[in-house]
Swiss-Prot record:
InterPro entries (alphabetical): BRO1_dom, BRO1_sf, HR1_rho-bd, HR1_rpt_sf, PDZ, PDZ_sf, Rhophilin-2_HR1, RHPN1_2
Taxonomic lineage: Eukaryota, Metazoa, Chordata, Craniata, Vertebrata
Tissue-wise expression: Widely expressed. Highly expressed in prostate, trachea, stomach, colon, thyroid and pancreas. Expressed at lower level in brain, spinal cord, kidney, placenta and liver.
PROSITE patterns: BRO1, REM_1
SUPFAM superfamilies named in the record: HR1 repeat, PDZ domain-like
UniProt organism field: Homo sapiens
Gene3D superfamilies: 2.30.42.10, alix/aip1 like domains, HR1 repeat
Protein name, entry field: Rhophilin-2
Residue ranges constituting the PDZ domain according to the UniProt record: 515-593
Phosphothreonine PTM positions: 655
GO cellular component assignments: cytosol; perinuclear region of cytoplasm; plasma membrane
Keyword Endoplasmic reticulum carried by entry: no
Amino acid sequence: MTDALLPAAPQPLEKENDGYFRKGCNPLAQTGRSKLQNQRAALNQQILKAVRMRTGAENLLKVATNSKVREQVRLELSFVNSDLQMLKEELEGLNISVGVYQNTEEAFTIPLIPLGLKETKDVDFAVVLKDFILEHYSEDGYLYEDEIADLMDLRQACRTPSRDEAGVELLMTYFIQLGFVESRFFPPTRQMGLLFTWYDSLTGVPVSQQNLLLEKASVLFNTGALYTQIGTRCDRQTQAGLESAIDAFQRAAGVLNYLKDTFTHTPSYDMSPAMLSVLVKMMLAQAQESVFEKISLPGIRNEFFMLVKVAQEAAKVGEVYQQLHAAMSQAPVKENIPYSWASLACVKAHHYAALAHYFTAILLIDHQVKPGTDLDHQEKCLSQLYDHMPEGLTPLATLKNDQQRRQLGKSHLRRAMAHHEESVREASLCKKLRSIEVLQKVLCAAQERSRLTYAQHQEEDDLLNLIDAPSVVAKTEQEVDIILPQFSKLTVTDFFQKLGPLSVFSANKRWTPPRSIRFTAEEGDLGFTLRGNAPVQVHFLDPYCSASVAGAREGDYIVSIQLVDCKWLTLSEVMKLLKSFGEDEIEMKVVSLLDSTSSMHNKSATYSVGMQKTYSMICLAIDDDDKTDKTKKISKKLSFLSWGTNKNRQKSASTLCLPSVGAARPQVKKKLPSPFSLLNSDSSWY
């Protein structure tokens, strides 16, 4: 993927009317979404403080011998655990605050669930990158102050992306730029000393790593989360809005699935493979729900084939939500998924199952065999509506027999009312769902409609009706699927392209310092030929020519000629430049390639040479004692309140005890003042 994105030649970083890529939304704007993110930031800090207090109490309990002290510490530890549980419930309340993200013109529709953006702390790239440029590339790092400032501005802007395609492009631009930065400045054999801290969007617990892959994985997660917010913002009262919502949720599922497949050892619960699998299912379920709304938007005619289609579409939505609820109820996801999300999935599963039975009942009760009716087609549709017909009934006989149709239709109404009752009951059990007024209205209206329809057709002998309505077969005319991110469609210019072509001048390759070669062309003969393009190499060097005597070697890369940078020049351009000096003395600087360094794993967001085990290993649950390449035992994942307990102290302490980065840094010269410098909080979000 990266190879397709490499720039063919240096491009100007500043383009007219293209400055938005360094800008997010105004972080000081008091919008509903910004207030929600600010509350999330405050909660994250409180959770971090509580986790540190619990870790300290556990350490004290471990070393204390006095019984009174131990009893007091145990009491304090119980208070801290209680505080953590309350903070977790508050964070869950933010995650189910769906009203903030819905379209302002939403009317009578069930809200959709968006994902909140992960938060991060500031990172100062300046000192580390300048030192590496001087050490590895033998160039003055201060010549790249503007490029480093651009990178830091871009990262800061990604903390407040706008809720539209521009915001998505901003995040994807930074993700691709991180690929360039990783290739140029992050060798696989050592850590660079940059600490990246990101907060879990579901639990609020911070994770810190010196690995750039944590940064890339978190940016991808935020890209998927932003797509979900775009999807919930779409106007679901219009055909175009619903199509946009379907597309946004499919793209969100694609980004999250790509994250799951690419970064397999993620360091936080919200990016663990199990959690991401559930989130992908949730996005596809919401896309399928939008498909049903798109079909129902023009109105549902009381016509046989239309009702069959709508009933099966509703059954499809109910089926995917039932599968989603089952996935949310499995360990280890169950311990960390917001309870309100699982409850809403269960509510929707019953609600749409009820709609499937309701529409089936209407088509059976109101059906009339009129002259010219295509009974064969209707018989085929009715037979495909069920896996099997009730005992003693056949599709054709049921269509012709009014009594059988009404009895079967009322059986469907009874099942619809049962599902409605279950959806209302499930919604009433969850405090967060009870506070969503539009959800309560939709559920009650649907339940009342089914009840009134049944009352209109109720007869005295209905208790003798022994027909059990079968389940409706789920079917859809538009099967939703993930849409993978298309990074290759986005043109991104490497900020540090002045260092040279990335395929050659990267952190994986070691170079000699530039050597100055002074020589002259004798009778127009340079004494060597050239090969390659950007950069050009010395080839077929005459051992007796002046360039060879001056120290040139075959295979050297030409980086400059008479102070003209040649790293991006083609062979013909370099040859033309050399010949332009005639027989005058030429000063040429060359570098030689040293031995290549070994590569590291590229699919683990937590792999790092020489680092002790971190919080990410809790997610992996890998047994410490098994050091062989054989299959390792998987231990049970920990719940929110069991992080950092005594028996798991070795696994959790390294990440929860976060260092503070406060070293003095040289002033970075920026092109434009950043509005983010006005913020006092490390993790302020829009």
